[in-house]
C-alpha cells in the first residue's frame, strides 16, 4: 500500500518530512473508505491532528537547520526546535494527551484498514524518536504514563476495536519508555517490542475483524460463545492475547522484560520504594 511504502521510505531514504505527510494523508483514505458519516468525521479529526503534528515537526526541522545548518536525522540539542520536534513526533507516537486521534480513528476505519494502521502509524514515530530522543528522561516518563493510561482506558471499553486501540497506546508506551531510558537493553527492548507488537496486534485486529465480519457486532456485551463457530479465529486470538500479555514463551515476554529490566536498573529511585514495600 501507499501508506506502508511511505513508512519504509521514512526508514531507508530519510526523506522524512515528505513521506511523514504522505503517510498521514494515505492513512486518511483507509478511514474514509469505510464510507459512513462517523468515518468521515473521524478521518477529519485524524488529519487535523496530523496537520498540527506535521506543522510542529516542520517548524522544528527549520529551527534545527537554522541553528546547526544540518537536517540530518539524529540527536537534537535542547531548545524550541527540540520541543517542536518532540510534539510533532508525539502526535504520531500517541503521546498523552496527543493520542486521542488513535482510539477515535482506528475503530472507524475499514476492517483491513485498521490492521494496516495498527502496524505502521505509531511505529514510524517510534523509529524517529529512537533516532532523535534516545536517553531523554521526559520521554521515558511519558512512556510510563502511556503504559498505565492506555491499559486503564482499554479496560473501560465495550467496542472491541476501541479496546485494542487504547491498548496500542499502552504498548507503544513500552517502546517509548525503552527509548527514553536510553541504555543498550532499553533501546533494543523498545525496538524489539515494535516488531513484536506488529505481529500480535495485527493478529488481534484481524481476529476481531473476522468476528465483526461474521457477527456484524462490535460490542463485547453482544458477543460470546464463538469458540465453536470460529475455532481457528479463537486459537489465533488466544495466541495473540498470550503474546500481548507477556506470558513466558511468547514474544511479548522477551521485549517487555527487556524494557522493564532496563527501567529497574536505570530508575532505582522509583523501584526502590516498591522493593521496600514488598
Describe the residue ranges of each PLM region.
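Short, well-ordered junction/capping motifs at the entry into regular secondary structure
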Residues: 1-2
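Hydrophobic transmembrane alpha-helices and their helix-loop junctions in integral membrane proteins
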Residues: 6-16, 26-270, 276
Amino acid at each position: 500500500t501507499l501508506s506502508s511504502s511511505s513508512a519504509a521510505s521514512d526508514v531507508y531514504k530519510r526523506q522524512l518530512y515528505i513521506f511523514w505527510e504522505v503517510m498521514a494523508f494515505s492513512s486518511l483514505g483507509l478511514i474514509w473508505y469505510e464510507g459512513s458519516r462517523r468515518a468521515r468525521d473521524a478521518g477529519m479529526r485524524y488529519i487535523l491532528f496530523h496537520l498540527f503534528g506535521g506543522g510542529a515537526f516542520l517548524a522544528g526541522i527549520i529551527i534545527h537547520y537554522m541553528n546547526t545548518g544540518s537536517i540530518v536525522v539524529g540527536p537534537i540539542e535542547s531548545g524550541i526546535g527540540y520541543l517542536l520536534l518532540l510534539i510533532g513526533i508525539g502526535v504520531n507516537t500517541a503521546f498523552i494527551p496527543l493520542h486521542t486521534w488513535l482510539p477515535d480513528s482506528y475503530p472507524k476505519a475499514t476492517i483491513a484498514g485498521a490492521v494496516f494502521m495498527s502496524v505502521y502509524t505509531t511505529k514510524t514515530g517510534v523509529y524517529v524518536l529512537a533516532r532523535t530522543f534516545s536517553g531523554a528522561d521526559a520521554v521515558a516518563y511519558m512512556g510510563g504514563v502511556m503504559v498505565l493510561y492506555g491499559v486503564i482506558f482499554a479496560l473501560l471499553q465495550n467496542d472491541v476495536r476501541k479496546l485494542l486501540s487504547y491498548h496500542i497506546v499502552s504498548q507503544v508506551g513500552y517502546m517509548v519508555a525503552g527509548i527514553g531510558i536510553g541504555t543498550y537493553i532499553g533501546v533494543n527492548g523498545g525496538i524489539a517490542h515494535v516488531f513484536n507488537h506488529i505481529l500480535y496486534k495485527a493478529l488481534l485486529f484481524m481476529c476481531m475483524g473476522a468476528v465483526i465480519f461474521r457477527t456484524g457486532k462490535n460490542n463485547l456485551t453482544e458477543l460470546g460463545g464463538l469458540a465453536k463457530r470460529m475455532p481457528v479465529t479463537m486459537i489465533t486470538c488466544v495466541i495473540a492475547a498470550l503474546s500481548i500479555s507477556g506470558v513466558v514463551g511468547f514474544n511479548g515476554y522477551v521485549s517487555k522484560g527487556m524494557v522493564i529490566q532496563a527501567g529497574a536498573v536505570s530508575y532505582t529511585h522509583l523501584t526502590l520504594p516498591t522493593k521496600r514495600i514488598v
